Amino acid sequence: MTVVTLGELLDAGVHFGHQASRWNPKMFPYIYAERNGIHVIDLVQTARLLTHAYEFVQKASQEKKSFLFVGTKRQAASIIAEEAQRCGGHYVNNRWLGGILTNWSTVQKRVEYLKELDAKEEDGTLDRLPKKEAAFLRREQEKLSHNLRGLINMTQIPDIVILVDPKRETTALLECRKLGIPIISILDTNCDPNLVDIPIPANDDAVRSVKLIISTLADGILEGKQSYQ
């Protein structure tokens, strides 16, 4: 029994890969066919691996593990924020600042500073400051919020990272590998599945495809939480 049907995957366009000329040969086991120069992803494999990932995050969630969702490409950004917040995860959906994981103690200080600025905005402190100073602090707040808002409740390095498009998120991928953090990732036909722990072969350019995969993983996390709530 899989957590999604082949029909649902098909309807979301999960099967559309990249141009065959752009493929990574390591994705061969997950490719069903080539049509008009485009690789077609084997949805049986996608359903199997998505189910495996779902069960993995569900169990991890039962054990109160923490999750970080990463996807900065335009098609994924809003989905990443929405689904991470829905299941109580953390997220990066604008720009990955080098060292978020490998230099977390420094990044955490910036997150704490953002919290301070938020508190000053909320209690009216900024409104009582001289205009120039208030304007400067609001610019700081906006800049930090842009890149770190999704980490506002993160107190330590996450236990599991969920990625969209590891080719784009190379720095995040390398930081996870350096620290031994398990990676679950949507992989299109141009990616290397050997770099992640649980690959989910899928179209990473279509909003509906990304939404289906990421929301299914968020569902798994929520289901795991129900066991202790």
Curated annotation (Swiss-Prot):
- Coiled-coil residue windows: none
Which InterPro entries does the entry link to? Answer: Ribosomal_uS2, Ribosomal_uS2_bac/mit/plastid, Ribosomal_uS2_CS, Ribosomal_uS2_flav_dom_sf
**PROSITE patterns recorded:** RIBOSOMAL_S2_1, RIBOSOMAL_S2_2
Where is it mainly found? plastid
Q: Where in the cell is it found?
A: Plastid, Chloroplast
What does UniProt give as GO cellular component? chloroplast; mitochondrial small ribosomal subunit
For this protein, what is any one GO molecular function term? Answer: structural constituent of ribosome
- Tell me which family the UniProt entry assigns to this protein: Belongs to the universal ribosomal protein uS2 family.
- Name of this protein: Small ribosomal subunit protein uS2c
Q: What is the lineage of its organism?
A: Eukaryota, Haptista, Haptophyta, Prymnesiophyceae, Isochrysidales
